[in-house]
Amino acid sequence: MTATKPKMMDLAYAVLLEKRKEPMPNVLELLPPIGFSPEQVPISIYEGYKRTKIVPLLNLTFEKGNETADFMKQVFAKKWTAQQSCLIVLNKVNRCIDIFKAVKQYLDDNSFNNPIFCLSTNILPAHRFERITAIKTALQKGEKPILIATQVVEAGVDLDFDMGIRDLSPIDSMVQVAGRVNRNAHPIEPKRLHLPLYVMNLGDCKPIYGVLTEKQALASLSGKVEILEAAYLGLVDSYFNALGEMASFQEKSVAIFDAMEQLQYDKVSDFELLEKQRNTVSVFVQVSEPNDAAEKCKSAYLNFKKGFLAKEDFDKNFKQNFHQHTIAIPRYYAENAGLTPLDDFILLAMDVHYDKDTGFIRNSKAKEADIPTFF
């Protein structure tokens, strides 16, 4: 149901074991909060929370091919003010880049001086860390930054915004983004009540998460004007219950479970939580840096591959930094950019291929990828 309180045992029993008349596994929560029994935890902890609310904007329509302009007009310009820090989370890297550019232009056109940042897997890991640090510094100084990001921001990033905007996604993902709004406030007695996370549907949910997720996410939000934080637990619970009851979900789960029992590992290996990024390539980006860190670790990598540098030395002194300058991008963007091979497995990109704000420069003439962008 959440990262810290998963529902997988309940779903596994309902879908796989109950129909075989097998007993419910005895599941013990090892670390319930002190003073609470496991069955008391959900109601006792969550029902008093008042920091945020989810506000569906599913009545809005976005013209295909004109989604960014429609977003700026219907959502951003109407919901955001210069006195608010804002987190915008999208499902695709390309969408993230397009909206970042549009928001940046909007700020310039209106003479707003809010700091603006982009964060996605298209940006080097080394630069992502620097960016998060810069955002934290801006927030601590009382500035009102805007962050446009993909789902990478959900993975343990400790930031606190005044409002959020989320493209349609699994309900638990929405709740994670809501956790970056009014984050540091007292959960029960916040100074500001129920700061909003607006949820829209740009059409990118289905290609990333699948038709079942899109269908159930829409059903979970349908007819609701707003959902207060106290109701999040029930919202997530009902969402996963409904997913578990879908026939196609059950059929796939049973098929995988049967394959595991029969040791048919080829079928098991076909299971994917998200579509694999099969058509991606690893790219080392040799960006100019004051200490020439990228150039040094590239040279060390080549010396290691040629046998001039011991593996132990490379792993100890260069490996981490090498990976901090490596990203995975769709193959056709790399081919379109004319990158040169660093070795048989990794391509080399230079400053000319990399934008300091949005990362690897994706030629707009290349075909857009409908691949996940979590990590």
What are these regions (language model features)?
Residues T2-P6, L90-V93, A149-V152:
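A short beta-strand-to-loop transition that corresponds to the Sensor-1 phosphate-sensing loop
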Residues Y49-T52, S111-N114, E143:
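A short helix-to-beta-strand connector/capping loop
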Residues M163:
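Conserved phosphoryl-transfer motifs of two-component systems
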Residues D10, F62-V89, N94-T137, S169-I171, ...:
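C-terminal helicase lobe and adjacent C-terminal extensions/tails of nucleic-acid helicase motors
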